[in-house]
Structure formats: C-alpha cells, structure tokens
Amino acid sequence: MSRVSNSDNYSLAGQQHTVLGSGRTSSLLWTSNPGSHFRSETRGNGRENGQDRVKRPMNAFMVWSRDHRRKVALENPQLQNSEISKRLGCQWKMLTEAEKLPFFEEAQRLRAMHQEKYPDYKYRPRRKAKMPQKSDKPLPQTPLLHCAGRRTYTSTSGCPFLIHGRLFLRATQSQTGGAVKPFAAGATAISALQQELSQQHRTLRCHSGNVGYADIRRRSLSL
C-alpha cells in the first residue's frame, strides 16, 4: 500500500488497486475534498520514487472528446482505441471556432484550478528507453595486414598479399605451432610469394580473374 503523508488539507479517503495491461499495479488515490475529486496515479514499479504522479490538465480537445469517445466506442465496439482517436480528431477539425469556444473556456478553467492546487507542478514527459543499435558490418574473415599497396589479391589458400606495393607482407600459419610468422619486405617477401605460387599450382584467384605465376613475377620484378 502506498504511503501518503498527513496534511491539513488532504487525507487518504480510499485506495483501489487495479492491474494495467502491462501487468503493473496502479493505485488510485482520492482526496477527501468533495469539490476536487482529483485522481492521481502511482506506478507499482517505483519509477516515480514513491510519489503520486500528478496528471496534466485536460485541453479543449480532451474536454470535447471525453463524452464523444464513449459514444463512438458504444456504437463501434470492434474499433481499437487508436482508430477511435483518429475519428475523433477528424470530427474535431470539422468543428467551427464558435463550436470549439465552450471547450476552450472549460479547458482554461481546469488549467487555472490545476495551477492553484499544484503551483510547483512541471510537466515531465517520460523518456523512451533507447535500444542499442546493431552493427550491420560483417567481421573480417582474414587477418588484417597494414601495408602500403595498391591492390590486394587472395590466393587459393585464402591468404591475402599485396601486389604493386612497396611492401610485400603476408601472414602464414606455422604447421607446427600454429603461430603467425610475418615475412620482411624485399627479397624475402618475393621468395615467400614464389613458394606460395608453386604450392598452389602457380595460379591465383584475383578480383579480375586468374593471374598466372609469370604475370605475378613480372609485376614483382618491375617494382
């Protein structure tokens, strides 16, 4: 049961528990002042820090739709609440300024009463929880090589290396321990490239098609 502080003007006259659609309990607190009958709502999950949540005063449209919503719901029981709101919105727009005037005056009167009862009231809209954004970028399947080059080719074994670049670097798996052994630039890298080509039948699968061993060797020596 919610705790309500004792006051000279207000006291807890009754408390009624209801269950909301989301499964949370809601307490309806009514004051002893027969002239106000103001209803405040508290959530059972403690989000309001145990304090009563003061509802905003009704505007002109809410005052007008208070009775019309009930009428439309009785005439069309199959309609959802959102559809009823759309119909009421269209009907409200079709009214003339003279027809809307009494409801604006009533809304102004309710706003003045609300401000008199709750002078420190400030509207605090509830913020929606932000969902974490999922990244659509796929994870790299091959080891990343930080090299200065223009083209990247992939051999039949799946190991990438660079052609037409200043450095020839390649990551290979050791057959004994499985550790990655980097090759230095220059002649050592060219020798490693030749061994790779001979082991893979001197063919490579490139982005533009198959490139033979002689073509790769000619490009390497031209640097």
From Swiss-Prot:
The keyword Transcription applies. One of its GO terms (molecular function) is calmodulin binding. The keyword DNA-binding applies. Keywords: Acetylation, Activator, Calmodulin-binding, Cytoplasm, Differentiation, DNA-binding, Nucleus, Repressor, Sexual differentiation, Transcription, Transcription regulation. Pfam families: HMG_box. Residues 23-35 have a biased composition (Polar residues). InterPro entries: HMG_box_dom, HMG_box_dom_sf, SRY, SRY-related_HMG-box_TF-like. SMART domains: HMG (SM00398). Acetylation of Lys-130 contributes to its nuclear localization and enhances its interaction with KPNB1. Deacetylated by HDAC3. Residues 54-122 bind DNA. Residues 38-55 have a biased composition (Basic and acidic residues). CDD domains: HMG-box_SoxA_SRY. Gene3D superfamilies: High mobility group box domain. Residues 23-55 are annotated as: Disordered. Belongs to the SRY family. Interacts with CALM, EP300, HDAC3, KPNB1, ZNF208 isoform KRAB-O, PARP1, SLC9A3R2 and WT1. The interaction with EP300 modulates its DNA-binding activity. The interaction with KPNB1 is sensitive to dissociation by Ran in the GTP-bound form. Interaction with PARP1 impaired its DNA-binding activity. This is Sex-determining region Y protein. It comes from Equus caballus (Horse).
